[in-house]
């Protein structure tokens, strides 16, 4: 009879734990990314950017600031090691390289909405170009964007959000280098 009572106790404990974890899993997956980006009209942040080559050795560390508003309007400013500023009004991209004393103005034309921030904040671009999966680790929402095109499979984007603040973006740049941007002082809208 004692074994039976003990078995019931373990079984009941197991059921309670199972219910607890199934509720926890449900709450972990309740982060609605599309709702988040729909409400993200603008943001500003400081960042540290780390660029790595194929053998994962650090090539470059950069620091700067970003101010972003929907419709491809942004100011992305690198402060260290080189002072470079990218300014987009949604139609043109102006690049100012202070060290080279050079300004380049480009029409965004068909490349509109192809910058990293637009790729992860535009629902239509996400639906068209990526398969998206999200999961939670230590209270952080990790959103993984895998390109639908087979030749782009290496260009996976990873976005980390906690407490409605973007903490990190990781991606491959045009030179097949791994880039991680860690954000601080994130302010939205």
Q: Can you annotate each of these PLM segments?
A:
Residues 2-13:
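Bacterial N-terminal signal peptides that target proteins for export
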Residues 13-20:
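Bacterial N-terminal signal peptides
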Residues 61-63, 81-82, 152-156:
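Short, surface-exposed coil-to-beta transition loops
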Residues 65-114, 176-179:
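An acidic-aromatic
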Residues 100-140:
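Flexible, surface-exposed loop/linker segments and immediately adjacent secondary-structure boundaries
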Residues 125-189:
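Gly/Pro-enriched, hydrophobic low-complexity segments
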């Amino acid at each position: 009879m004692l074994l039976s009572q003990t078995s019931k106790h373990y079984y009941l404990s197991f059921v309670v734990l199972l219910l607890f974890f199934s509720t926890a899993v449900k709450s972990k997956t309740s982060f609605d990314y599309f709702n988040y980006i729909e409400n993200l009209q603008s943001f500003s942040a400081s960042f540290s950017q780390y660029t790595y080559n194929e053998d994962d050795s650090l090539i470059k560390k950069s620091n700067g600031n970003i101010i972003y508003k929907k419709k491809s309007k942004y100011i992305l400013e690198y402060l260290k090691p080189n002072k470079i500023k990218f300014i987009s009004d949604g139609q043109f991209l102006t690049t100012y390289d202070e060290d080279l004393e050079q300004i380049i103005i480009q029409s965004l034309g068909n490349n509109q909405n192809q910058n990293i921030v637009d790729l992860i904040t535009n629902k239509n671009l996400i639906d068209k170009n990526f398969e998206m999966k999200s999961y939670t680790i230590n209270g952080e929402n990790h959103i993984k964007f895998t390109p639908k095109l087979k030749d782009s499979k290496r260009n996976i984007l990873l976005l980390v959000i906690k407490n409605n603040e973007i903490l990190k973006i990781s991606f491959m740049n045009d030179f097949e280098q791994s880039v991680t941007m860690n954000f601080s002082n994130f302010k939205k809208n």
